Amino acid sequence: MNYFELFKFSPAFDIDTAVLAERYRELQRAVHPDKFANDTEQQRLLSVQRTAQVNDGYQTLKDPIRRAEHMLSLRGIDLSHETTTVKDTAFLMQQMEWREALEDIRDSADPQECIDELYDSFAAYRTKLTKLLTAQLSSDSEEDALLAADQVRKLKFMAKLHDELTRIEDALLD
């Protein structure tokens, strides 16, 4: 299913999330199972299925990584069950530096400063990747689609690192 069509968007990485939320509420009202309580079993089942599609579409388009994956899947590139690793040497080196910095936080004289520096580093790198991804997803070339898939892989890795950093920060606050 093309969630961009469902929510009446042109396929694009940058979408107005406020408009997305508004269209989500409209679709929810239109397909909500309570609206079909007195209809046939088949119509009620269809309403439940449609509600699930609307919910999944909203969650997909709301999240930038899932949105990019969806755009790539519409172009025949499925990253959902992928085990391909990033082969970009510079990114792998950066990844190792981040991992070492994560390990050093607890022994640091000022753990919060280290955490803040890592959050800033992640944000700067994520911004760089997102700019590349936006340009690559707006292109019609197969090569750019494959490059976009690499950016998504990197963003997924960074999301895991960000979650790990958040867990470390939470543990230090306890």
Curated annotation (Swiss-Prot):
It comes from Shewanella sp. (strain MR-4). SUPFAM superfamilies: Chaperone J-domain, HSC20 (HSCB), C-terminal oligomerisation domain. It holds the Pfam family HSCB_C. GO terms for cellular component: iron-sulfur cluster transfer complex. Co-chaperone involved in the maturation of iron-sulfur cluster-containing proteins. Seems to help targeting proteins to be folded toward HscA. CDD domains: DnaJ. SMART domains: DnaJ (SM00271). Keywords: Chaperone. One of its GO terms (molecular function) is ATPase activator activity. One of its GO terms (biological process) is protein folding. The gene is hscB. InterPro entries: DnaJ_domain, HscB, HscB_C_sf, HscB_oligo_C, J_dom_sf. Interacts with HscA and stimulates its ATPase activity. This is Co-chaperone protein HscB homolog. The lineage of its organism: Bacteria, Pseudomonadati, Pseudomonadota, Gammaproteobacteria, Alteromonadales. PROSITE patterns: DNAJ_2. Belongs to the HscB family. Residues 2-74 form the J domain.
